[in-house]
C-alpha cells in the first residue's frame, strides 16, 4: 500500500510541470519557463528529471520549450536503488507468504497431533475402566489396547517427544509474540517509505529464520535443556518402575515355589518400636498398618504402591481376598490386624504373605515388603524360638536381588541394631542396604549428623535421617496427606538447627529424600537386573514349554472347556439312559413292586388260614368268608396310595441311575460337581412329584369301586400268577436248603422231633438244644408248611376250576394279579407324561445353567482343583501364560532401555 501511494504521488507531481507550463493552450517564453522551474527546484522537485523518466503528460507538452536535461553522478545510486526497489519488495512478499504458510501448516500439524493424543487418551482411560469393571464382575480379562507403532512414530506420542514438543511450542509462541511486537514498533516509528519497505523484508526474513531455529533445540538454554532432560528421565524412570512392578505382580500369580525368577523389592527390616510402620505410612501418606503393644505384624506384608494420576481418591486392594476397592484406610488397617492376629501366639509368625496394592496420585511406584520386627525377649504365650523364626523369615526376603531398608532408631547405638547385623550377614559390603535413622529429634543434632556422615558403619547408599512421627489424629482431618504433614514437621525441625544446614547432608534428611532415594535405587536395581531377569524368564519359559509338551502334549485346557467336555460325556450317558428307561421299564418296575404287595396280601390273609387246605380241595364251595377276604385284598391294593408309591418308586430309580452315571463320568473326581448334578435331578423330580402323584391317583380312582376283568386279561393273569407262585416256591425251597446245610439234616431232624414232642407234651421238656437252634427249627417248620401250601395252590391254579374269570373267589391269586396289571398300566401312562418326559427335557438344561452359567471363576477354579492331575496341568498352563506375558513386557522394556542409552 505504501508503494502504491508513493507512485500515485509521483505521477501527480510529474503531471504538474506540463500543466503549469502550458495552461489553457498558452505558450510561455523560455525566460518565464526557467524562472518557474528554478522555483520548483528550490522546493526539492525536479520536473525535467521526472519528465525524462516517465515521459510527458501529452505529446505536445514541450514542443515550444527549449528544455535542458541536468545529469550528475549522484543520480546513479538513486537510479539503481529505484530500479531494485520493486524486485526486493516482491521477494519480501513471497518470503513472507511462504513463512506464513509454513507456520499455518505447523499449527495444523500440532493441532492434529493434539487431537489424536487427547482422543486416544480418552479411549484408553474408558477402555481401562471397562476392563476393570468386567474383571471385577465376571473375572474375564479383556485385552489391552494400544496405539499402533507406526501411528506413534508419525504422531510422536511417546513421553519424551511429547514433553519436548510442549516446550518447543511454548518457546515458539513466546518468540512469535516478541517478533510481532518488534515489527509493530518498527512500523510505527518509520516514516520513510523506503525504510518501510526494507523493514518489511527484514522482518519477514527474521521470521523465516526464527521459524527454522525454533524447530530445533538450539533455541533452548542450558538450564532448560537440563530441566527437560531431568523431567524426561523422571518420566522414564516412573514408567520403567511401573512396568517392572506389573511384571512382578504377574510373576507372583504363578504361585510356584520352584520358580527361580525374582524381581527386586525393597525389604523393610528393623527391631520392634524402631519406627518401621511410621516410615512406611509416611511414604504412603496414610495410616494403614496394624499397631499394638504386642507383636502385631506376624506375616509379611507385600505392599505395592502404584502411581495413578487419574485416581482422585486413594484406595487399596487385597490380593486373594474378594473385598474390592477399599477407600477407608482405617478399614485396611483393621483387615491387616485381623489377618495378622489370625496367626496364633503359640506359632509366632507365618511366612504366608499378605499382598496389598495401594493406588493413589501422590505416591511413587514402589514395591515394599514389611516384615515382623526383631525381638530380644519373648513373652510367655510366644514360642521360645520366636527370635530364630523371625530371623529365618527375614533372611528369606533380604537375599539378592532385594534391596534392604534397615530401619534404626537414632537413640539406639547402631552397633546394637539388629537390622544392620542381619544386613551385614547377606550384604557384607553394604551395596544393597539403605540405612534409615528414625527419631532424629530425640538426639542432639551433632550426634545425628555424625550418624548421617556414614563413617562408623558405612553403607553404599548411606543413611537418611527422618522424624516421621505420626501427628495426633485430632490435629488434622482424615483427608489430609500424612506425607506433607511429616515433611512440614521435619522441615520445621531441621531449619531451626543450623547444624543441618550443611549442603552435604541436605539430600539425606527428610521423608521426601527417602522417597527419592527409594525410587532411584529401585529403578537402578531393576534396570541393572533387567537383562538377567529377562534371561531367567526366558529359561523358565523354555523349561515350562518342554514340560507341558511332554506331560500334556501341548493340549490347551481351561476350566470352562473341561466342564463342557465332562458335561458332553455325561449327557451322552444320560441320553443312553433315557433310551433304556421308558414306559416298559417303568411298567416292569411298578409290576414288580405290586407283585410283592400281592404276595404279601396272599401270605397274610390266605396262606396263614387254617382252613386253606380244605378250601383248596373244595373249590366249588362259595363262602362269604373267602369272598370278604378277596374284596378286602382288592380294596387294600387299590387304596394303597398308588400315586405316591409309584411316583416315589420311579424317582428313586431315576436318582440311583443318575448317581451311577455321575460316578462313571469325569465328574467322579469332583464331589462338588456330583452334588450339583444330584441336586439338579432331585429339584426337578421334587417339582414334578406332586403333580404326577395327583394325576395317577385321579386315574386309578374308578378301580377303588369296581374292577372288571375280561377273558384275555384273566388268561394272561393266570399264567403270571403261576409264575409268581413258582418263584415263591423256589425261594422257599432255597431257604430250606440253606438251613439244612447250615445245621445238618440229621441234627435238624432231631430238632424237629423235639419241637413236635414239646408241642404234644403237657409238661415242659428239658432244654436239650440252644435257643438259636430251636429258632432255626421253627423256621424250618414254617417253610415246610409254606412249601406245602404253595404246591397246593399251584395245583389249584392249574386245575379246571381256575379256567374262567368267574372263579375269582376260588383263585384270588389270578384276580389280584389282574387288578395289579390294570393299576400298573394306568399309572405308567401318566408317569411317562408328567414325570419322565419333563425330567428328560429339563435335566440337561438345568445342568448347563448350574455348571456353566452360574459358577463364578473362583468356583470354577475350586471345582477344577479337586482333580489333582487337572490341577497340576492348569497350574503349569497358567505358569506358561504368565511367563509369556512377563517375557513380552520385559522384552519391550529392554528395547526401550537400549533406545534410551543410545539417545
Curated annotation (Swiss-Prot):
The UniProt-reported impact of residue 300 to S is: Temperature-sensitive mutant; multiple phenotypes, including growth delay, fragmentation of mitochondria, a reduction in the number of mitochondrial nucleoids and the amount of mtDNA, and a decrease in respiratory capacity
> Which stretches does the entry tag as region G2 motif?
296-298
**Where in the numbering of this chain does the Dynamin-type G domain appear?**
260-531
Q: Where is this region: G3 motif?
A: 370-373
The top EC class is hydrolase
Q: Which GO MF terms are attached to this record?
A: GTP binding; GTPase activity; metal ion binding; microtubule binding
Q: Which domain of life is it from?
A: Eukaryota
**UniProt-annotated binding residues for Mg(2+):** 277, 297, 370
Can you tell me which residues bind GTP? Answer: 273-278, 292, 439, 441, 468
Q: Does the keyword Transit peptide apply?
A: yes
What residues form the membrane-spanning segments? Answer: 86-103, 198-214
Q: Where is the composition biased (Basic and acidic residues)?
A: 167-188
User: GED domain: which residues?
Assistant: 805-898
* Annotated InterPro entries: Dynamin, Dynamin_GTPase, Dynamin_GTPase_CS, Dynamin_N, Dynamin_stalk, G_DYNAMIN_dom, GED_dom, LIS_MGM1
Q: Where is this region: G4 motif?
A: 438-441
Q: What is this protein called?
A: Dynamin-like GTPase msp1, mitochondrial
Q: Which organism is it from?
A: Schizosaccharomyces pombe (strain 972 / ATCC 24843) (Fission yeast)
Q: Tell me the classification of the organism that encodes this protein.
A: Eukaryota, Fungi, Dikarya, Ascomycota, Taphrinomycotina
Amino acid at each position: 500500500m505504501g508503494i502504491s501511494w508513493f507512485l500515485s504521488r509521483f505521477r501527480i507531481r510529474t503531471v504538474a510541470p506540463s500543466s503549469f507550463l502550458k495552461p489553457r493552450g498558452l505558450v510561455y517564453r523560455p525566460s518565464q519557463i526557467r524562472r518557474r522551474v528554478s522555483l520548483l527546484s528550490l522546493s526539492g522537485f525536479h520536473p525535467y528529471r521526472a519528465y525524462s523518466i516517465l515521459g510527458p503528460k501529452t505529446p505536445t507538452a514541450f514542443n515550444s520549450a527549449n528544455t535542458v536535461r541536468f545529469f550528475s553522478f549522484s543520480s546513479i545510486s538513486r537510479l539503481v536503488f529505484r530500479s531494485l526497489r520493486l524486485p526486493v519488495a516482491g521477494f519480501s512478499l513471497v518470503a513472507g507468504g511462504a513463512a506464513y504458510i509454513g507456520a499455518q501448516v505447523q499449527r495444523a500439524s500440532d493441532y492434529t497431533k493434539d487431537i489424536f493424543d487427547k482422543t486416544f487418551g480418552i479411549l484408553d482411560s474408558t477402555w481401562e475402566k471397562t476392563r476393570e469393571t468386567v474383571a471385577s464382575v465376571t473375572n474375564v480379562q479383556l485385552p489391552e489396547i494400544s496405539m499402533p507403532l507406526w501411528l506413534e512414530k508419525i504422531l510422536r506420542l511417546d513421553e519424551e517427544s511429547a514433553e519436548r514438543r510442549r516446550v518447543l511450542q511454548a518457546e515458539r509462541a513466546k518468540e512469535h509474540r516478541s517478533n510481532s511486537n518488534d515489527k509493530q514498533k518498527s512500523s510505527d516509528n518509520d516514516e520513510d517509505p523506503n525504510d518501510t519497505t526494507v523493514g518489511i523484508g527484514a522482518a519477514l526474513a527474521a521470521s523465516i529464520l526464527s521459524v527454522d531455529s525454533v524447530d530445533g533445540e538450539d533455541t533452548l538454554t542450558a538450564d532448560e535443556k537440563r530441566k527437560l532432560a531431568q523431567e524426561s528421565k523422571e518420566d522414564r524412570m516412573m514408567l520403567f518402575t511401573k512396568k517392572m512392578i506389573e511384571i512382578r505382580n504377574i510373576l507372583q500369580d504363578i504361585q510356584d515355589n520352584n520358580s527361580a525368577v525374582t524381581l527386586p523389592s525393597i525389604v523393610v527390616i528393623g527391631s520392634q518400636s524402631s519406627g518401621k510402620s511410621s516410615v512406611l505410612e509416611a511414604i504412603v501418606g496414610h495410616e494403614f498398618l496394624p499397631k499394638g503393644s504386642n507383636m502385631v505384624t506376624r506375616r509379611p506384608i507385600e505392599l505395592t504402591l502404584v502411581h495413578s494420576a487419574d485416581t482422585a481418591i486413594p484406595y487399596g486392594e487385597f490380593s486373594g481376598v474378594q473385598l474390592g476397592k477399599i477407600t477407608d484406610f482405617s478399614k485396611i488397617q483393621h483387615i491387616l490386624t485381623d489377618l495378622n492376629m489370625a496367626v496364633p501366639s503359640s506359632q509366632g509368625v507365618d511366612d504366608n504373605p499378605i499382598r496389598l496394592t495401594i493406588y493413589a496420585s501422590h505416591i511413587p511406584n514402589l514395591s515394599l515388603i514389611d516384615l515382623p520386627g526383631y525381638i530380644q525377649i519373648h513373652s510367655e504365650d510366644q514360642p521360645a524360638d520366636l527370635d530364630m523364626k523371625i530371623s529365618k523369615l527375614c533372611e528369606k526376603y533380604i537375599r539378592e536381588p532385594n534391596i534392604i531398608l534397615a530401619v534404626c532408631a537414632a537413640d539406639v547405638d547402631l552397633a546394637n541394631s539388629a537390622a544392620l547385623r542381619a544386613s551385614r550377614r547377606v550384604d557384607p559390603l553394604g551395596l544393597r542396604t539403605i540405612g534409615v535413622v528414625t527419631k532424629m529429634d530425640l538426639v542432639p543434632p551433632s550426634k545425628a549428623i555424625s550418624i548421617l556422615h556414614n563413617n562408623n558403619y558405612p553403607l553404599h547408599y548411606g543413611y537418611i535421617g527422618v522424624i516421621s512421627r505420626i501427628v495426633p489424629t485430632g490435629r488434622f482431618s482424615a483427608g489430609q496427606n500424612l506425607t506433607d504433614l511429616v515433611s512440614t514437621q521435619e522441615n520445621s525441625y531441621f531449619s531451626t538447627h543450623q547444624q543441618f544446614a550443611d549442603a552435604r547432608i541436605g539430600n539425606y534428611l527428610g521423608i521426601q529424600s527417602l522417597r527419592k532415594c527409594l525410587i532411584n535405587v529401585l529403578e537402578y536395581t531393576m534396570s541393572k537386573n533387567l537383562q538377567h531377569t529377562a534371561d531367567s524368564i526366558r529359561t523358565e519359559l523354555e523349561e515350562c514349554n518342554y514340560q507341558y509338551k511332554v506331560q500334556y502334549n501341548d493340549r490347551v485346557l481351561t476350566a470352562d472347556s473341561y466342564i463342557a467336555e465332562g458335561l458332553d460325556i455325561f449327557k451322552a450317558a444320560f441320553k443312553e439312559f433315557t433310551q433304556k428307561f421308558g414306559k416298559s421299564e417303568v411298567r416292569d418296575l411298578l409290576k414288580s413292586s405290586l407283585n410283592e404287595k400281592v404276595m404279601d396280601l396272599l401270605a397274610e390273609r390266605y396262606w396263614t388260614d387254617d382252613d386253606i387246605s380244605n378250601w383248596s380241595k373244595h373249590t366249588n364251595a362259595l363262602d362269604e368268608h373267602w369272598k370278604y377276604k378277596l374284596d378286602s385284598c382288592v380294596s387294600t391294593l387299590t387304596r394303597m396310595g398308588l400315586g405316591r408309591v409309584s411316583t416315589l418308586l420311579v424317582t428313586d430309580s431315576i436318582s440311583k441311575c443318575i448317581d451311577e452315571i455321575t460316578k462313571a463320568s469325569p465328574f467322579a473326581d469332583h464331589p462338588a460337581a456330583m452334588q450339583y448334578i444330584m441336586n439338579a435331578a432331585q429339584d426337578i423330580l421334587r417339582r414334578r412329584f406332586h403333580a404326577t402323584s395327583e394325576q395317577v391317583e385321579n386315574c386309578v380312582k374308578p378301580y377303588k369301586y369296581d374292577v372288571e376283568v375280561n377273558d384275555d386279561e384273566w388268561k394272561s393273569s393266570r399264567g403270571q400268577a403261576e409264575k409268581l407262585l413258582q418263584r415263591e416256591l423256589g425261594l422257599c425251597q432255597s431257604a430250606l436248603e440253606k438251613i439244612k446245610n447250615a445245621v445238618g439234616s440229621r441234627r435238624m431232624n432231631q430238632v424237629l422231633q423235639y419241637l413236635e414232642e414239646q408241642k404234644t407234651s403237657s409238661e415242659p421238656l428239658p432244654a436239650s438244644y440252644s435257643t438259636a437252634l430251636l429258632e432255626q427249627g421253627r423256621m424250618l417248620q414254617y417253610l415246610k408248611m409254606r412249601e406245602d401250601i404253595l404246591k397246593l395252590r399251584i395245583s389249584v391254579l392249574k386245575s379246571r376250576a381256575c379256567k374262567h374269570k368267574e372263579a375269582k373267589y376260588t383263585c384270588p391269586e389270578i384276580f389280584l394279579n389282574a387288578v395289579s396289571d390294570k393299576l400298573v398300566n394306568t399309572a405308567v401312562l401318566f408317569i411317562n407324561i408328567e414325570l419322565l418326559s419333563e425330567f428328560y427335557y429339563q435335566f440337561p438344561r438345568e445342568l448347563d445353567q448350574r455348571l456353566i452359567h452360574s459358577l463364578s471363576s473362583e468356583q470354577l477354579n475350586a471345582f477344577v482343583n479337586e482333580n489333582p492331575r487337572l490341577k497340576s496341568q492348569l497350574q503349569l498352563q497358567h505358569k506358561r501364560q504368565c511367563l509369556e506375558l512377563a517375557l513380552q513386557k520385559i522384552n519391550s522394556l529392554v528395547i526401550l532401555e537400549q533406545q534410551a542409552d543410545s539417545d
